[in-house]
Amino acid sequence: MVGYWHWHSLHNAIETYWKGLLGHDFEPNPTYNEAKTIGADFNRLNDDLLGFRKKNDVAFFVSNEAMTGFDDFSFGWFSSEKYNDILRPFYDALYKMNVGVDFVDPSTIERLDNYKMIIVPILYAASDEILEALNTYVENGGHIVYTFKSGFSDENVKVRHTKQPGLIRKVTGNYYNQIVKPENVTIKGDQYKLDAKDEEVKYFMELLTTDSDTEVLAYYDHPVWGNYAAITENKYGKGLATYIGFMPGDKLIGEIFKDQLKKANLWGKDQELTFPIIIKTGVNKKGKTIRYFLNYSAKKQSLDYKYGKGSELLKGATIQSGQLLTLEPWGVQIIEEN
């Protein structure tokens, strides 16, 4: 769906300057004229674009209960960070890496097995049943990535009496009973090869101790807390559970996900391209693969087209595998594979 706010600009009240396709004078303008070209293209290409279906192998597990519980406490008094402030950087990292994701929640818990990887950010409040379902997902071969403050309290926001991170501890292979507000802390012993400034530890950190067979992907770089794990990875059943005990910066999140995607066999041609080139792939009603190549920048962008031979639908050009594609500033090409 392509939606516009609004059809025309309102003339009074709070939405006066939430401009529409038409201005306050109801006259055609560049925005309106551009929308007309989009409508004409859609009308011309209906048979190729309608019925577009997309299958994602990665999902975020989100929860209104966890959001409400975390937002009430955050990281303590005077902390301004909310649930979505933690979720969004993790989503943004995958978006920029051209990894399509779905969002699932406790009401769709039975769909977990549809995904090869599930990211679970700050699942602060959750019932035993939900945590056990996530454990079963890993046991059956799923790859899960938890962040800090997951499994901490039950659905009533009552903190669990067990070692943290609660019931998920048996799949994460770690535990903690000390938490710290980080100051001048980075990580060490990792393979992410970033500058120290990009390996910062933000907002909050859990001092993780691991079970004997749990792998440590990073430790905290700090004179007192250097023996504690920061990122851990544990095999459980047929699957793998990764646990991030702190809030990373944007570049570090990207490197963590790059490593995790490769381990889950989810690193492919799309991931060789990064923002501002964004790729959206699906199948149309004719059963043919459609790829949208979008340039979200004010500069021309070029890429090697490494997919199957096809047709660029907007201009009708034939596209060969290995051909160089050039995207105009803010431009798009839509390629249907033969």
Segment roles from a protein language model:
Residues 1-338:
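Carbohydrate-binding surfaces of carbohydrate-active enzymes
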